Amino acid sequence: MAFISFPPRHPSSSARLPLTLIALDDWALSTITGVDSEKYIQGQVTADVSQMTEQQHLLAAHCDAKGKMWSTLRLFRERDGFAWIERRSVLEAQLTELKKYAVFSKVVIAPDDERVLLGVAGFQARAALANVFSELPNSENQVVRDGASTLLWFEHPAERFLLVTDVATANMLTEKLHGEAELNNSQQWLALDIEAGIPVIDAANSGQFIPQATNLQALGGISFKKGCYTGQEMVARAKFRGANKRALWLLAGKASRVPEAGEDLELQMGENWRRTGAILAATQLDDGQLLVQAVMNNDLEAESVFRVRDDANTLHIVPLPYSLEE
């Protein structure tokens, strides 16, 4: 029996989100297994996976030789290897790049479409899951395994959980929360990631940015002490020579349409508007507010005013839940 996804509805902000079960169809799961899996993935991503415990998950970037990100990966350990979650739109291209040198190692790299990705967020999310699972993750143990399920804990923008599970458990959870929880699609999780300042790399922006342009260093996603990995020289240069002049920003406001990933924005300069930045993700909330995640210059004034191109409405900067000060 397959897992049936949920119909779309406008997402809510974390502050107003009722208990919600979210089908994460826009994200995809992949795995690397085999005796060389740790050594191999260590040579491909920005984070130091050798230091990662069974109870941790982390965000890392997979870069090209120029240090530009193919994608960001939410990594965690699994059996004799690792699993990761990324945007479905970049899955195929990212796996193709990751497999390029796999012929020289004892590893198997593959997408995993058998399992289901679900999010649980909103009012009393922990209490709802406690009725289903014997143990839940928290700030100290961010990853918990329970039977066929792996549960990942997220702190921002408010406590939420990501479940990697089988179809039977996904259907059981949907049934148990029926009538108690709202059901929504990937847009709700996307809205929460945007609020949390977690970079969203879709196909339109793959190969465009170094990790620091999306604040990955502030999210613990870059190790400057580990050994070589693809793109390391350019990522290190950006830090030690101050070559990175960009950052990820959260904007909120109104617009007559939801812009696409890859579009630019316009910055108000006196009476005029100047094109700036690149949109990573955007979504419209149920109260009409537009949330936009964009890469722009890292020296913007906090009071800067923006707009979707040629739109009559405006957007403003919203503080992120972490600091970029090093």
Curated annotation (Swiss-Prot):
Origin species: Salmonella typhimurium (strain LT2 / SGSC1412 / ATCC 700720)
Family (UniProt): Belongs to the tRNA-modifying YgfZ family.
Major location category of this protein: cytoplasm
Gene Ontology CC, one term: cytoplasm
Function recorded in the entry: Folate-binding protein involved in regulating the level of ATP-DnaA and in the modification of some tRNAs. It is probably a key factor in regulatory networks that act via tRNA modification, such as initiation of chromosomal replication.
Entries under Pfam families matching the protein: YgfZ_barrel
Location in or out of the cell: Cytoplasm
Name of the protein this chain belongs to: tRNA-modifying protein YgfZ
Keyword vocabulary terms for this entry: Cytoplasm, Folate-binding, tRNA processing
Ligand binding (folate): W27, W189
InterPro entries referenced in this protein's UniProt entry, alphabetically: GcvT/YgfZ_C, tRNA-modifying_YgfZ, YgfZ/GcvT, YgfZ/GcvT_CS, YgfZ_barrel
Keyword Cytoplasm set for record: yes
A GO biological-process term: tRNA processing
One GO molecular-function entry: folic acid binding
SUPFAM superfamilies: Aminomethyltransferase beta-barrel domain, Folate-binding domain
